[in-house]
């Protein structure tokens, strides 16, 4: 079975050549049709950002170039609403009962769910935002997916990042190319880096729990479900923090330079460790091989 995904190369940053190839472009092969086996968190990143948001943008550009009526409809809607083309309701779809400050900037293609609050100074570009989400002042969202019930306090920054439902990314925290699980808290002033300062290949955990080359010059990290991360942490690229982990910045561990397992969680040293329940134990008894394409 051969499926033509109709890929096209799209750049998302022009950077110095030491961060990319000789052309200085960071690019993805973006398919117009999507088919992907998900074995690890890196595949979730690819599915949401590359096969999801980038592909939606590529399909929009293709239709805009080939369909004159579509182009005229968008232009007419923008003129009627008195908005820029990328801000018109044809490209920015907003659900019911939303409260959006007029000083927020939202560029499409963007989809916003029901009961969403977006405050002044927020900038949102090409994102998918679920229901019951709170986006506070000066939040920056670009090419990101935000799940239902998430809370983003002021000056949170997400770039090419997936945040699953009921999670909170506290103020002045920056996540780039990351995946965050459900019911997780990440404290204020934390930074998730995505680039090796020396040109060593980036490796991430694969579906079998082994370190494999990520085949990307830049990539962020993964935080599991039901995690509690304190303020002021710095996380190196491609690190994995398992579900149910609690991390508190300390003299011993403020910079996360290794993958963190549940057994390494800080809450085991707390006075009442039983107050943080383990909700997502690994299914180690299932020893069958992962099916993959």
Regions found by a protein language model. Name each.
Residues 1-85, 89-90, 238-239, 244, ...:
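Terminal amphipathic alpha-helical/low-complexity segments used for targeting or macromolecular assembly
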Residues 138, 152-293:
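Glycine-rich hexapeptide-repeat left-handed beta-helix
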Residues 50-51, 147, 181:
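Residue-level signal for well-ordered alpha-helical positions
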Residues 95-157:
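Acidic, glycine-rich loop-and-beta core segments that form the ion-binding/anion-interacting portion
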Residues 34, 141, 175:
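Short, flexible active-site loop motifs that bind/organize anionic cofactors or intermediates
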